[in-house]
Amino acid sequence: TVYDPDTNILINVFKEQFARLNPTHAGEAEQTLKTIRQELDNDDIGRSFYERLSSVSPVRLVDFENPKNNTYHFTAEFTCKRDQDEFRPDITLFVNGLPLVFIEVKKPNNHGGMVAESKRMNQKRFPNKKFRRFLNITQLMIFSNNMEYDTMGGIVPVQGAFYCTTAKQSAPFNCFREENPTNLDIAPYNADFPYKDIDPIVEKKILTDFNCQVIHTSPEYQTNLDTYTPTNRVLTSMCSPERLLFILKYGIAYVRFHKEINGKIEFIEQKHIMRYQQMFAALTVRSKIDEGVNSGVIWHTQGSGKTALSYYLTYVLSDYFSKQNKVAKFYFIVDRLDLLKQASEEFEARGLVVKTASSRAELMEQFRNNQAQEGNTGKPEITVVNIQRFAEDRSKVDLPAYATNLQRVFIIDEAHRGYKPEGSFLANLLDADKNAIKIALTGTPLLKEERESWRVFGNYIHTYYYDKSILDGYTLKIIREDIETQYKERLSEIYEKLETLVEKKDVKKSQIVEHDNYVKELLRYIISDLKRFRQIQGDNTLGGMVICETSEQARKLFAYFDEIQAELNKDASMKSHLRAGLILHDSDDKDTRDKIIDDFKNNMTVDILIVFNMLLTGFDAPRLK
């Protein structure tokens, strides 16, 4: 087979399939190949190529609707080479001649487990600009040592089968667990898959090509042929044509973050791939609508990416309804202003145009507008609504009576908080369009009274519990680390001395934890602990959050922070330059507080956040210790 060594595209296969999928543009195959070569050189994590791959107009590279219209090839040890640098993935999968997937397979119990494989990708392959073309064209990477997931005593699995997509520096390895609601030995998708028998002639040819005919009779080889090994299961789950095309079409997102460096805002782009629970939720929503169900609850635990799921759903459902000649219009409903801001930022980071409504009149105008897109950007849009703003509004919502080809989709966030659907503005809003799709998201189970109030939404569509999220490493276990003995003794000593004053009624108990001596000793511990933790982890971006017992204690911790740090630095061989930020509802104005949170979450210019009585919900800060 003729291939292009610059991109590893199978040229003849690509041209044949291009002509087949685009009969009126058949002569453009060569020019398209040339453009793809140029795009793959871009420093954009493959965005321009992915936009071409996933689009259906003016030409198609892949037929996403009819899997059988595409051709699928695989090869082993296909070298990716540029100048003197090269790497050789174990297996490469091609769709219409395009090398879109590679798979690295290791022996069970390989040295370092899959962590070693992750380091190799993150330290050697992703940062190497010579490999940019090959990584930009690759959409899915799978790594497996053919073992069941095992954390080996840690928190995140280090053995098993993992997947990721391209990155500039490092990509997180994701677990994949096939849907298996009744815990059968083999998940239904794998058990029912129409596998074909292995052709002995093809098998012999492959073994001969790799000069390893001798392994044919070995017990290990026979075990590896088992359809249900961890590697074979993940290949069926992610690389069977229907699933792979779904992931390629809907499972990739480019996310743009900002970061302030030396007073300048810099943008960082990442490429994300759908987590498996998001994929199954999206597939289930689609099949439920097929069955005539137009509402339900998705229970995905905190931290599992519900806003990202909502983003993916906008694409999945837009396509779904366009096949029925309907145009989908999306509303994301929250119950607090800070959540409106957070959701809007998340959607915008992924490229959606966000509309918000600051008054009922404005919302009603958007609601009555029968176009899915109100702007002229051509980008998909979503309207984010803070329902709290309309809490007292109980008047009926009227819509034009005539039928339209518009399909409204409501996604209600944090449904467990009980929006009281009966008789409220939300109820009136949802009732105004009986044909709307209504999806309620919750991160915690609905309690009895909440469940009652949400009966209008029907049953759970999909669930992803916190135990799985912890196993997958998305939700962290909170590890209670005892305070070091020497500090504990000093703090106890101070506490006991002050407690005698409490008994004499000279001070209140709350004042102990606010006392200068207590606060200063606590700061000595916090600063030393974070400094040492960073050294152990070899990561100076790690930050901490202090949740105080009283607001006065928070103020004092902040007030003495620099003084205590300077005192510790006097005798330290390695000095620390930590910066603290204080967040209290009555401290500074809202813009300043937002800036402090942004400096902690994104800009990394605040190292320790001091708060009282609030863990800032949805606090998505991966740098937190």
Task: Set out the residue ranges of the language-model regions.
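Inter-Walker segment of RecA-like/P-loop motor cores
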Residues: 350-395
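Conserved two-lobed SF2 helicase motor
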Residues: 378-392, 602-617
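Conserved C-terminal RecA-like helicase domain
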Residues: 378, 509-611
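ATP-dependent helicase/translocase motor core
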Residues: 1-329, 338, 342-353, 378, ...
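SF2 helicase catalytic motif II
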Residues: 401-438
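Interdomain helical connector at the RecA1-RecA2 junction of SF1/SF2 helicase-like NTPases
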Residues: 451-541, 558
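Short basic/glycine-enriched coil/helix segment immediately N-terminal to the Walker B
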Residues: 95, 290-294, 376-379, 395-408, ...
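Conserved RecA-like helicase motor-core motifs
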Residues: 297, 329, 344, 351-365, ...
